[in-house]
């Protein structure tokens, strides 16, 4: 009865108004799983390949009709008749069918849509929520959110070089209170920016995108807003950054054009160390470029004992890239984006590898999202303890927070909020 009898993909729109793939997997008993695939703006060079049509007469070349056709054709032909509860077999079949190292033939967006939709169908067939189906009986930890309240870099049209300025409400008692604390700081920040005559327009991930040049000015606004909202920075709420440094690494230098700085790897490490010394920053993502392995090692040696150093473009949720990072002593945490690797099975393998190496994991959205809240379930399923899913604005971001609130309610007294346990 859990046999797959039909797979159907369609072209829908993501939060940026760009096409993406949505897949339905239907089982013999009528059960259906549905998944929509996210898309990034600042993408790592080593990510699995998203298949786009390239037809400039439709969606400026960003259509995904070919990826949908791959699902409805080759992939459906290969998977119809398989048992939806055999996730490893389903994913392995698609990887073999694609035949490339980076899923470029069928498209990672096609493969991932089917992988996640199959898992959802199987969970429903087993009458279990997705977090329980994937994570088993031990899935009970609600993650501390990294709430992106000021956007820069590729996520906003402003001079700020660093892509994301985030708050982490570690002192909350539960996810419900964590969301409330974040919301209160978010709205306080809006008032502070408005009072300073700055724009309160929002970026791709729902954070504000003010015309600020300096990283320190952005951090100062956030600290002031935390305090005015009634919380203590560095005790109840900490700060986190996503530099997305690959985006401004040019000709061997870190070009912070908004601040008029051109830094070597060593100078960039010193720049970040000074920020950590002056502000309650506990996590920095993609602080160095994806190919600057020596810079990553220097950064980890300098700050890794007290700051979570997250590899996103560095690792791209890929076990092979992660193994290199572990061997080189580069970073101490992995960002988890299911569409970077392209299947649920490979994602879980990477998470397990990171955990066994003593790395932390941070479940993450992409800047181009949909109402699909799968990553909320996966954050709980993996007990990773942290999630990045944007600000307290835009329904595509709030869908994940709201799902976490529902999961916490369903878990009842067994639910645990990661809270201060994430501090190094």
Swiss-Prot record:
Cofactor binding summary note: Binds a second Mg(2+) ion via substrate during catalysis.
Enzyme Commission numbers on file: 4.2.1.11
Pathway the protein acts in: Carbohydrate degradation; glycolysis; pyruvate from D-glyceraldehyde 3-phosphate: step 4/5
Residue positions binding Mg(2+): 242, 285, 312
Single GO cellular component term: extracellular region
Catalytic reaction list: (2R)-2-phosphoglycerate = phosphoenolpyruvate + H2O
Protein name: Enolase
Function: Catalyzes the reversible conversion of 2-phosphoglycerate (2-PG) into phosphoenolpyruvate (PEP). It is essential for the degradation of carbohydrates via glycolysis.
Keywords: Cytoplasm, Glycolysis, Lyase, Magnesium, Metal-binding, Secreted
Requisite cofactors: Mg(2+)
Species in which this protein is naturally found: Roseobacter denitrificans (strain ATCC 33942 / OCh 114) (Erythrobacter sp. (strain OCh 114))
């Amino acid at each position: 009865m859990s046999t797959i009898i039909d797979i159907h993909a369609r072209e829908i729109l993501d939060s940026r108004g760009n096409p993406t793939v949505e897949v339905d997997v239907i089982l013999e008993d009528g059960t259906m799983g549905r998944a929509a695939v996210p898309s990034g703006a600042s993408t790592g060079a080593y990510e699995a390949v998203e298949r786009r049509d390239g037809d400039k007469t439709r969606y400026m070349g960003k259509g995904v009709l070919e990826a949908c056709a791959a699902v409805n054709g080759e992939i459906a032909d290969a998977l119809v008749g398989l048992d939806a509860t055999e996730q490893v077999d389903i994913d392995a079949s698609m990887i073999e069918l694609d035949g490339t190292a980076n899923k470029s033939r069928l498209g990672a967006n096609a493969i991932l849509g089917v992988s996640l939709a199959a898992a959802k169908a199987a969970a429903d067939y087993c009458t279990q929520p997705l977090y329980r189906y994937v994570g088993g009986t031990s899935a009970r930890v609600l993650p501390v959110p990294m709430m992106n309240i000021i956007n820069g870099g590729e996520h906003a049209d402003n001079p700020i070089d660093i892509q994301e300025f985030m708050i982490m409400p570690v002192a909350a008692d539960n996810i419900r209170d964590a969301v409330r604390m974040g919301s209160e700081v978010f709205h306080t920040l809006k008032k502070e920016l408005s009072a300073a005559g700055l724009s309160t327009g929002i970026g791709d991930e729902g954070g504000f995108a003010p015309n600020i040049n300096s990283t320190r000015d952005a951090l100062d606004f956030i600290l002031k807003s935390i305090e005015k909202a009634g919380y203590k920075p560095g005790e109840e709420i900490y700060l986190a950054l996503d530099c997305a440094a690959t985006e401004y690494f040019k000709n061997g230098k870190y070009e912070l054009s908004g601040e008029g700085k051109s830094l070597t790897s060593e100078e960039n490490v010193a720049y970040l160390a000074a920020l950590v010394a002056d502000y309650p920053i506990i996590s920095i993502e993609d602080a160095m470029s994806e190919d600057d392995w020596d810079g990553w090692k220097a950064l980890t040696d300098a700050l890794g004992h007290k700051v979570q150093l997250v590899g996103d473009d560095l690792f791209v949720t890929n076990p092979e890239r992660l193994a290199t990072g572990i061997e080189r002593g580069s970073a101490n945490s992995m960002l988890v984006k299911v569409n970077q690797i392209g299947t649920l099975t490979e994602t879980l393998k990477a998470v397990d590898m990171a955990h066994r190496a003593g790395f932390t994991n941070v479940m993450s959205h992409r800047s181009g999202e949909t109402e699909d809240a799968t990553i909320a379930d996966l954050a709980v399923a993996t007990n990773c303890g942290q999630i990045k899913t944007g600000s307290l604005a835009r329904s595509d971001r709030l869908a994940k927070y709201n799902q976490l609130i529902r999961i916490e309610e369903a878990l009842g007294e067994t639910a645990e909020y990661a809270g201060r346990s994430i501090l190094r």
